[in-house]
Curated annotation (Swiss-Prot):
Name assigned to this protein: Uracil phosphoribosyltransferase
Protein purpose: Catalyzes the conversion of uracil and 5-phospho-alpha-D-ribose 1-diphosphate (PRPP) to UMP and diphosphate.
EC number from the UniProt entry: 2.4.2.9
Top-level class of the enzyme under EC nomenclature: transferase
Residues annotated to bind uracil: 193, 198-200
Catalyses which reaction(s): UMP + diphosphate = 5-phospho-alpha-D-ribose 1-diphosphate + uracil
InterPro entries reported for this sequence: PRibTrfase_dom (IPR000836), PRTase-like (IPR029057), Upp_B (IPR034332), UPRTase/APRTase (IPR050054), Ura_phspho_trans (IPR005765)
Record comment: activity regulation: Allosterically activated by GTP.
């Protein structure tokens, strides 16, 4: 079963309160989502492998460490875009791919309509980013697509999840760790996380 990490940090909790508030403006919501993405990055990267390199300081040569593998951020369009800048600010060397999904009207399952990834997904560490882990369908479909393209080290990064989404993702991809800022109570009858924060995409981009 895949590892589930729900971050417990006062700054993250403070910022989560801001984005849960229905009265928070689009601008503040978007900025805060990025800030939470940056804070989460410390947790999701703490076990990454490093290698020794030699650098020359103004005083003398010394041995330092740098990341061994390329980091690749893959947001699920469109809401996943809101977290990209925060993560990228922490790891500017990270490359960015994109995947877009739509829901098939008959099967109700997500289908990929757009996928563009750096070749580094083959040997790099891939972060699949989506603010909400609700049914788990989109996350599962995105990770399946990445694995079909050769990705081996994949992690899911979200803001809010629920037990239903976590269970599905762990069943479909038991090798994929899940990192969340919060684990909420449940899904309601129309598929929204409760208490959640509403539609993350609409709140990020000011749409209805």
């Amino acid at each position: 079963m895949g590892k589930l990490v729900v971050l417990n940090h006062p700054l993250i909790d403070h910022k989560m309160a801001l984005i849960r508030d229905k009265n928070t403006s689009t601008k503040t919501f978007r900025e805060t989502v990025g800030e939470i993405g940056a804070l989460i990055t410390y947790e999701i990267t703490k076990d990454l492998e490093t290698v020794e390199i030699e650098v020359e300081t103004p005083i003398q040569k010394t041995i330092c460490r740098q990341l061994k593998k390329q980091l690749v951020i893959v947001p699920i369009l469109r809401a996943g875009l809101g977290m990209v800048n925060g993560i990228h600010d922490m790891v500017p060397s990270a490359k960015i791919g994109h995947i877009g999904l739509y829901r098939d009207e008959k099967s109700l399952e997500p289908v990929s309509y757009y996928a563009k990834f750096p070749t580094d997904i083959l040997d790099g560490v891939v972060l699949v980013v989506d603010p909400m882990l609700a049914t788990g369908g989109s996350a599962t479909a995105a990770i399946t697509e990445l694995k079909n393209r050769g990705a081996k080290d994949v992690r899911f990064v979200g803001l809010v999840g629920c037990p239903e989404g976590v269970k599905r993702l762990q069943m479909d991809h038991p090798d994929v760790p899940i990192y969340l800022a919060a684990l909420d109570e449940k899904l309601n009858e129309v598929g929204y996380i409760v208490p959640g924060l509403g539609d993350a995409g609409d709140r990020l981009f000011g749409t209805k």
